[in-house]
From Swiss-Prot:
Free-text function comment from the UniProt entry: Peptide chain release factor 1 directs the termination of translation in response to the peptide chain termination codons UAG and UAA.
SUPFAM superfamilies, alphabetized: Release factor
Compartments (UniProt record): Cytoplasm
Classification via InterPro entries: PCRF, Pep_chain_release_fac_I, Pep_chain_release_fac_I_sf, Prokaryotic/Mito_RF, RF-1
Keywords on record: Cytoplasm, Methylation, Protein biosynthesis
Family: Belongs to the prokaryotic/mitochondrial release factor family.
Any one Gene Ontology molecular-function term assigned to this protein's record: translation release factor activity, codon specific
Organism: Pseudomonas paraeruginosa (strain DSM 24068 / PA7)
Name of protein: Peptide chain release factor 1
Claim: Chaperone is one of the keywords in the record: no
Amino acid sequence: MKASLLKKLDVLSDRYEELTALLGDAEVISDQTRFRAYSREYAEVEPVILAFRDYRKVQADLEGAQALLKDSDPELRDLAEEEVAEARERLAALGDSLQRMLLPKDPNDGRNVFLEIRAGTGGDEAAIFSGDLFRMYSRYAERQGWRVETLSENEGEHGGYKEVIARVEGENVYAKLKFESGAHRVQRVPETESQGRIHTSACTVAVLPEPDEQAAIEINPADLRVDTYRSSGAGGQHVNKTDSAVRITHLPSGIVVECQEERSQHKNRAKAMAWLAAKLNDQQQAAAQQAIASTRKLLVGSGDRSERIRTYNFPQGRVTDHRINLTLYSLGEVMEGAVEQVIEPLLQEYQADQLAALGD
């Protein structure tokens, strides 16, 4: 393991001892805000320190076994050789585990997300594919035990959506979906194509982490224009009786959000405001993410919405992720919700990139 990483672990060990003392301090215990903060930090640090202690113990065992290699007793030397080999193997495994524990954590990984899918080039076929993508992500969410709530939808003339916006709620949603942002291209023969020609169309996907309520971005009410209108979504006859749908325009940025899925105007407004906060937060972080991508060339995590990230070729049953040159011939399974077949290799590639940069 790199000396710089061992130094980090030594510093973390000192912090662990400090946290242990703080959590036993009467003054801290009486201050619930500080106590909760230290408890969260302790819970994050403890597994790393326990693993580091195991690493140090195995390291000591290895040194002891290596010393026995010089013993005059041949049987003892043979036994020591076995112990050295075993200790080296365990040390390598523990070192690898510790490195992964030290990887910088994305503070948004545990967040819920707003999922935006928009039809791009390709007209009706692009709208139909938007619907297919939304169904794919909904099936994937179901497999993960997540909840999908549609906020806004603009249906295509021949099926699918020109645009569909949803909130996805559950455990580690952003961690799993954050690399789905970008342009998704489809190649297939449309049902209306009589000559059997393959058409190419595209959709864009944006995955925005929902800001934490306590760290939510401040929005000046004077910067907003709020319009209400009659919903055209679900809800039976009620939707035509009241102006329950809400459209909010953020004047400084020009960002427009709308929500029409709830019968209550108040609920629609609250959801639209949460979505607006996510979009403004995303806008603020875009420059920083571009800087990181340019310095470390994190192609997997660039998040560029215009970047073509994936192609779905229906005649060949093929799905290709262009960022990591991954090609799978299980398109049917992926479209039915087995998106983990693409997501897991992406996460592994990103983690490998982080490991390569760790300790630099």
